[in-house]
């Protein structure tokens, strides 16, 4: 049975009768970059500024805006957001952990946080990643997924 569709059309599910429950979700994803770009990020030599700090802020903001971006997501009280990065030779892993005590899950918030953090990295390093024809031969976002979902 589809919970978001009835004979009148699309609707948002009524969660008013559900109890508040502590929920935690961790999502991750990767961006593949040229090793030279990773070096510039580590040395903080990217022209637009500090890549990882900017991406961290963007990821946090994205979590808080998820309900405005995804039509069937409920606005919910976010009690904690953490966006971290692991930097490898040719890629960066973004990890977004989100916590709430509410009636519905926070998977979409964690996934949105990771996605926007990775997109922000791409935006920050565009000039370093383009080849002589203006193409992105190396840059790739991949592996976005929910790593862990906890409902207490």
Swiss-Prot record:
A GO BP entry: Mo-molybdopterin cofactor biosynthetic process
Pfam families: MoaC (PF01967)
Keyword Lyase: yes
Reactions mediated catalytically: (8S)-3',8-cyclo-7,8-dihydroguanosine 5'-triphosphate = cyclic pyranopterin phosphate + diphosphate
Keywords attached to this entry: Lyase, Molybdenum cofactor biosynthesis
Catalytic residues (UniProt): 123
InterPro entries tied to this protein: Mo_CF_biosynth-C_arc (IPR023047), MoaC (IPR023045), MoaC_sf (IPR036522), MoCo_biosynth_MoaA/MoaC (IPR050105), Mopterin_CF_biosynth-C_dom (IPR002820)
Binding site for substrate: 72-74, 108-109
A molecular-function term among this protein's GO annotations: cyclic pyranopterin monophosphate synthase activity
Its EC number(s): 4.6.1.17
Pathway: Cofactor biosynthesis; molybdopterin biosynthesis
Enzyme class name: lyase
PANTHER family: MOLYBDOPTERIN COFACTOR SYNTHESIS PROTEIN A
Subunit structure: Homohexamer; trimer of dimers.
Family statement: Belongs to the MoaC family.
Physiological role: Catalyzes the conversion of (8S)-3',8-cyclo-7,8-dihydroguanosine 5'-triphosphate to cyclic pyranopterin monophosphate (cPMP).
HAMAP family linked to this entry: MoaC_A
Name by which UniProt lists this protein: Probable cyclic pyranopterin monophosphate synthase
Organism: Methanocaldococcus jannaschii (strain ATCC 43067 / DSM 2661 / JAL-1 / JCM 10045 / NBRC 100440)
């Amino acid at each position: 049975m589809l919970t978001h569709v009835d004979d009148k059309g699309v609707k948002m599910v009524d969660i008013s009768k559900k109890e508040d429950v502590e929920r935690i979700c961790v999502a991750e994803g990767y961006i593949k970059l040229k090793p030279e770009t990773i070096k510039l990020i580590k040395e903080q030599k990217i022209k637009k500024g500090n890549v990882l700090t900017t991406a961290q802020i963007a990821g946090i903001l994205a979590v808080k805006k998820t309900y405005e971006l995804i039509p069937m997501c409920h606005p919910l009280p976010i009690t904690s957001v953490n966006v971290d990065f692991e930097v490898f030779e040719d890629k960066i892993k973004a990890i977004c952990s989100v916590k709430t005590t509410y009636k519905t899950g926070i998977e979409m918030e964690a996934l949105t946080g990771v996605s926007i953090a990775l997109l922000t990295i791409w935006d920050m390093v565009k000039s370093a990643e383009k080849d002589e024809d203006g193409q992105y031969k190396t840059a790739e976002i991949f592996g976005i997924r929910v790593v862990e979902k906890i409902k207490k």
